[in-house]
Amino acid sequence: MAHENVWFSHPRNYGKGSRQCRVCASHSGLIRKYGLNICRQCFREKANDIGFHKYR
């Protein structure tokens, strides 16, 4: 069994490795609330387009 066959052969059905940002495919800093599945960096860029507004 070569290294190419072993790489990423472990099933990722749960945990951080199973979820990714729908914009940039990153696994870190994911916001899952309300089914967003967007990382926090992309959320700051797209928040106004999605409909989130900042109130003071």
Swiss-Prot record:
Coiled-coil spans in chain: none
GO molecular function, one term: zinc ion binding
Keywords, in A-Z order: Metal-binding, Ribonucleoprotein, Ribosomal protein, Zinc
Named cofactor requirement(s): Zn(2+)
Note accompanying the cofactor annotation: Binds 1 zinc ion per subunit.
Record bears the keyword ATP-binding: no
Amino acids binding Zn(2+): C21, C24, C39, C42
Biological process, per Gene Ontology: cytoplasmic translation
Organism superkingdom: Eukaryota
Stored InterPro entries: Ribosomal_uS14 (IPR001209), Ribosomal_uS14_CS (IPR018271), RIbosomal_uS14_euk_arc (IPR039744), Ribosomal_uS14_sf (IPR043140)
Record NCBIfam families: PRK05766.1
Name of the molecule in the record: Small ribosomal subunit protein uS14
